[in-house]
Regions:
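Substrate-binding/active-site clefts of carbohydrate-active enzymes
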Residues: 1-25, 47-53
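Non-membrane alpha-helical structural segments and their capping/turn regions in soluble enzymes
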Residues: 10-17, 41, 140-144
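Active-site-proximal helices and loops of the catalytic beta/alpha 8
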Residues: 21, 29, 34-119, 136, ...
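Short acidic/polar active-site loop segments enriched in Thr and Asp
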Residues: 29, 156-158
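Surface-exposed cleft-lining segments at the edges of enzyme active sites
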Residues: 131-135
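Hydrophobic targeting/anchoring helices
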Residues: 146-152
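Short acidic/histidine-rich active-site segments
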Residues: 159-166
Length: 183
């Protein structure tokens, strides 16, 4: 849990950098950084810059929920990509479930402007309900158009979450999500 890490100590920063460089040295090509809005921005900028000095192609993907912070996290702090949770995902989920017009996706992309290439579009992740679950769409086929649209109609990257390609329904879970403990 990132809230328990004491970022006020320089030793913490150095240890975090050591860990990042260790994994990069083994060939890991990037990190997904959880809830970046809760981590001190000064630390994030320093970490990203420090890792990229040695591994310039290393990728940092951030999970941020406030669209008003997207520009800062990409242009100022150095993230390569951000999950477009508050834009693409929230809109497309409502479109799939019949609660919004697909036109809003175009408005979202226009709003993001030059940041669109730094977005990571997705239909599922560990925090969200599975498309095929009864808590979401109830069928993976209901997301075909959204998948096609999200992957092909702009220059954002697209993430497939493990099991999504198989139509995983997560019906073993009470909330339509897949647990890391599911077998």
């Amino acid at each position: 849990d990132t809230l328990k890490i004491d970022y006020s100590k320089r030793e913490t920063w150095d240890i975090m950098l050591e860990i990042a460089l260790f994994w990069a040295s083994l060939g890991v090509d990037g990190f997904r950084c959880d809830m970046v809005e809760l981590v001190p921005q000064e630390f994030l900028k320093w970490l990203i810059n420090s890792v990229k000095k040695t591994y310039p192609s290393f990728i940092f993907i951030g999970e941020a929920y406030e669209k008003s912070n997207y520009y800062k996290f990409i242009r100022e702090l150095g993230f390569d990509y951000l999950y477009d949770k508050s834009g693409f995902y929230d809109i497309v989920r409502d479109v799939i479930c019949g609660g919004r017009s697909a036109r809003e996706l175009s408005y979202n992309w226009q709003e993001l402007g030059g940041l669109q290439g730094n977005m990571l579009n997705f239909l599922e992740n560990h925090d969200e309900q599975r498309i095929a679950s009864s808590a979401f769409a109830g069928s993976p086929q209901k997301a075909y158009a959204a998948l096609t649209f999200g992957a092909l109609f702009n220059n954002a990257s697209f993430m497939l979450y493990a099991g999504q390609e198989l139509g995983e329904s997560a019906e073993n879970g009470a909330d339509g999500r897949t647990s890391i403990f599911d077998s």
